[in-house]
């Protein structure tokens, strides 16, 4: 998991630092935010102190109604030794009690002109993206008709050559050789290329080529959600391969199950066309049109009609 510090959030959203500068390198370990309304009312039993605290108009207007002594106690309790930051929205004025408590405990107090809900949404999206679980897989990621296809297989099976043919057919390369994958949601995997090899494709006998330079900016993209895995393997004579497409194999990446197709490789098979059609067929299945199921249903009807005639 990547490290995110308060300083990163401050720079990303151009937040104004009010006080507690010594704590700007505190780590942020979770994407969940806290709006400590009930804590300002005095209930700290389940206070999530390790989260970024977000104060809006509602919390601060209630805070202003508290007696002076309670104001100091509430802010001292909000500013703990593990609280990454306290952020105020709408350019609200900062209570002096909060400034004093933040300087005392080294908790950064930041301010944003954004509305509270808008700021909360943007912060959550940023933190979920940066704190998402990550892994790296040997393969090629291509955007085919809007479907993120991760092509895997043993070294030398023809992954990069297939990707090159797909790019020539108008599809977009995301990553070759090494695909960095992060799980942004419970069932969302997003892949991208390491910065060092972004837009590059390695073809044996030809060397390294820059896809964006050769084919233009429309032939590449920086990241893509992975929807299906296509595993290329050398054809084995005695092995049984799926010929109808009724059985759906899956592959687990991090904590997400992804549909996986195994495509046997042998001379004369146009892998680029097969993968292209597989991506289109996958989209049709998700739209409720399954050719294999339609065929088996028709076959069952024909068999049933034949039995009735007998």
From Swiss-Prot:
One example GO MF annotation: ATP binding
Annotated residues for binding of ATP: 153-160
Effect of residue 204 to A: Reduced kinase activity and loss of phosphorylase activity
Cofactor(s) essential for the protein: Mg(2+); Ca(2+)
UniProt-reported outcome of changing residue 155 to C: Loss of both kinase and phosphorylase activities
UniProt region (Important for the catalytic mechanism of dephosphorylation), positions on chain: 264-269
Subunit composition and interactions: Homohexamer.
Further details from the record: Both phosphorylation and phosphorolysis are carried out by the same active site and suggest a common mechanism for both reactions.
Protein purpose: Catalyzes the ATP- as well as the pyrophosphate-dependent phosphorylation of 'Ser-45' in HPr, a phosphocarrier protein of the phosphoenolpyruvate-dependent sugar phosphotransferase system (PTS). HprK/P also catalyzes the pyrophosphate-producing, inorganic phosphate-dependent dephosphorylation (phosphorolysis) of seryl-phosphorylated HPr (P-Ser-HPr).
PANTHER family found in the cross-reference section: HPR KINASE_PHOSPHORYLASE (PTHR30305:SF1), PROTEIN YJDM-RELATED (PTHR30305)
Family: Belongs to the HPrK/P family.
Domains: entry comment: The Walker A ATP-binding motif also binds Pi and PPi.
Name of protein: HPr kinase/phosphorylase
Organism: Bacillus subtilis (strain 168)
Taxonomic placement: Bacteria, Bacillati, Bacillota, Bacilli, Bacillales
